[in-house]
């Protein structure tokens, strides 16, 4: 691959050392997809054009990364104001850098038309009404993460994990506040 120009801000020497340490690394990208009913709260997410399309955002992102087009909907996911999914940039980056990737389904309401690791988890409930997952399901999810994390990280120098979960940022904030 040709050298890419990288701009750094802050501690330039530290940034150079870090980027140089990654130069010969083998990267793999993992997209974790899921769904939470929290995303259905009006105004909480911009991960889909409207409430009906939210459930298609994650599987469509996974399909777009794999195929270059979506199978579960007619176009890439868009925000209510017409902005395209961040998966557009992710795909371009993965393609340019020739980084292999895979998908983990951690509770998507709609299953993508791609091969994926399946956690067998249900999607999350609305956290403003109840717990998203039962304590047993949380333990199951953490254990699945540990097992698959150990397995997939071993053959890689650098595993990059991304997510496509409408309402996921709000849910993550609630979890962190709960800690």
Kindly label every feature range from the protein language model.
Residues 1-114:
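Generic N-terminal targeting/processing segments that precede catalytic cores or assembly contacts
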């Amino acid at each position: 691959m040709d050298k890419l120009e990288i701009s750094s801000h802050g501690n330039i020497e530290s940034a150079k050392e870090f980027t140089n340490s990654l130069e010969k690394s083998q990267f793999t990208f993992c997209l974790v997809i899921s769904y939470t009913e929290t995303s259905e709260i009006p105004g909480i997410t911009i991960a889909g054009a409207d409430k009906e399309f939210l459930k298609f955002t994650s599987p469509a992102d996974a399909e777009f990364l794999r195929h270059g087009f979506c199978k579960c909907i007619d176009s890439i996911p868009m925000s209510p104001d017409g902005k395209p999914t961040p998966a557009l940039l992710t795909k371009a980056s993965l393609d340019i850098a020739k980084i292999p990737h895979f998908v983990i389904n951690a509770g998507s309401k709609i299953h993508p038309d791609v091969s994926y690791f399946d956690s067998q988890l249900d999607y999350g409930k609305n956290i403003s009404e109840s717990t998203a997952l039962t304590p047993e399901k949380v333990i199951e999810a953490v254990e699945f993460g540990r097992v698959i994390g150990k397995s997939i990280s071993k053959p890689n120098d650098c595993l990059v994990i991304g997510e496509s979960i409408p309402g996921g940022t709000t849910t993550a904030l609630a979890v962190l506040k709960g800690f």
